[in-house]
Structures are given as C-alpha cells and as structure tokens.
C-alpha cells in the first residue's frame, strides 16, 4: 500500500464505516473479498491463497467499508496521478490510450476493484463509498475520477441494450484502445433500445457515474483473463451537477 499517501479520517453513515486500509491484515481482507467477486463469481480458477492480488495493489490506497460489527461489506482501491504523463502507470493504461486526458488540469484519481458483499444494502454501501471518494477527490485536488467499469462475462449480446445506450448517449472518442479484442459501440444511433432494459444491464457503479455526468469509451474491451467486458469510464469533477456535488459533500462531511 502507498504508505506516503494522505489519508482522510473514517467516515460513518447509515450503519456503515468507510476507512482507509492500514497494514497487511486489512489488505488481505480486501483481497479475499475481491476473490469472491472477481474470481469465484466470475467462474475463474481459484487462486491457491484465496486472494485476488496484482502488481497494482502496493501502489494503491485501499478503502474498506464495514458494518457496525466490523464485518467487511465493501472495498475498493484508488491511485492518484499528479500529471498526464504519469497515467501510463495506471491499471487502465493496460487497455486504453489515455493521451486523450491530457487536456485536463489537475490530478487524476483512478478507482478500481470496487465490490460489495451480496447481502449488503447496495444503496447504503454505494452512498458511503461515494462519500469517501468525495473526500479523496478533495484531498488530492483531482480533476477527474476514472477507471474500468466491468460487465460480467464476455458475451456482448447480454448487454446489447446497454451498449446501444452507452454508444448513443454517453460515449466519447477521446479514449482509444490498446487491447487486442474490443467491441465498438454505435455512436450515431439516435434511438437506443428501451432505456429501462438498458439501465438494468448497466452495473450500479457505472449507473452512478453516468447520473453525475460521467462518460465512457466508444468501445468495450474483452478481458478474457478477468472474464469480463469493460469500458473506460471518466467523471470530470467540474461536470458534476451542483445539486449532486452538494449531496456528495454532505455525505463526505458526515
């Protein structure tokens, strides 16, 4: 973990506490939860140690979300980049050419490996997760929150309506691909598939991004290793509607 990072104090709200991971035990707890979400649930071969871990973990700061009994119900990791030229060291840069973000002035905060337990109240966990993210954005002075938003499995037909909607309403050509296998979106389509069906196919975290003015790449990457499809996702802080920004900061302030 990035021991040099500035850490916000824990955030308590709605029966949950969000805090920064401290030490190896906290990190292993997050990696074990991630194994359930990104290995077991994805039908991938289990890791011998039961942990989902990679070379980016030591570079990141990890956020844990616990209930009042101290049970881990959610986690994610973040990595901060001060300048566009540093983005090549991000997780997303394995799959996407991030040169298209060089117009931004300010820092870049990458969010990844977001997951919650299946029995957690998603809305409450998401709310406090975003509250802690708001604190981190303010702490680092980030101009954009970005990452890869994943769809389970690698069959694009399962997400046809979602991809139609993303292509028609939310896609940007500024991020090109570095991946070998991609699925392009129809960005010229004026009448996407039924919106309710499309939104039902979009993961909750990505729906939240979009509701705040976020945008996605004009293609999805097929990630065979993770058994997912994912899209680059960007949320420029200045583009968040004032009412949403105010609500987020109200949560962040506890």
Describe the residue ranges of each PLM region:
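Beta-rich nucleic-acid/ligand-interaction surfaces
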Residues: 49-56, 153, 223-232
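Short low-complexity, flexible loop/linker segments enriched in glycine and/or proline
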Residues: 54, 159-163, 231-235
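Long, continuous compositionally biased terminal/linker segments
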Residues: 232-254
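Acyl-donor binding region in acyl/amide transferases
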Residues: 81-214, 220-228, 240
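Short, well-ordered beta-strand micro-motif
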Residues: 64-66, 77, 232-236
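Intrinsically disordered, serine/threonine/proline
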Residues: 1-3
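Short amphipathic alpha-helix that is part of the acyltransferase structural core
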Residues: 5-73, 80
């Amino acid at each position: 973990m990035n021991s040099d990072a500035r850490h916000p104090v824990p955030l308590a709200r709605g029966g949950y506490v969000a805090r920064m991971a401290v030490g190896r035990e906290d990190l292993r707890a997050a990696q074990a939860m991630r194994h359930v979400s990104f290995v077991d649930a994805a039908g991938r071969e289990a890791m011998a140690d039961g942990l989902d871990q990679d070379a980016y973990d030591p570079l990141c700061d990890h956020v844990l979300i616990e209930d009042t009994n101290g049970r881990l119900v959610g986690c994610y990791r973040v990595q901060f980049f001060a300048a566009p030229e540093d983005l090549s060291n991000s997780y997303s840069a394995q799959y996407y050419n991030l040169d298209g973000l060089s117009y931004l002035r300010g820092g870049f905060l990458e969010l990844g490996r977001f997951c919650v337990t299946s029995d957690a109240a998603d809305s409450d966990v998401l709310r406090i997760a975003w509250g802690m993210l708001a604190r981190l954005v303010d702490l680092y002075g980030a101009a954009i929150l970005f990452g890869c938003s994943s769809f389970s499995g690698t069959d694009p037909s399962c997400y046809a309506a979602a991809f139609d909607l993303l292509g028609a309403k939310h896609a940007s050509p500024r991020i090109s691909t570095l991946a070998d296998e991609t699925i392009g979106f129809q960005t010229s389509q004026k009448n996407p598939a039924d919106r309710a069906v499309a939104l039902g196919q979009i993961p909750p975290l990505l729906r939240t991004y979009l509701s705040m003015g976020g945008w996605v790449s004009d293609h999805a990457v097929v990630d065979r290793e993770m058994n997912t499809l994912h899209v680059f996702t960007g949320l420029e802080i200045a583009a968040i509607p004032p009412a949403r920004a105010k609500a987020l900061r109200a949560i962040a302030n506890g």
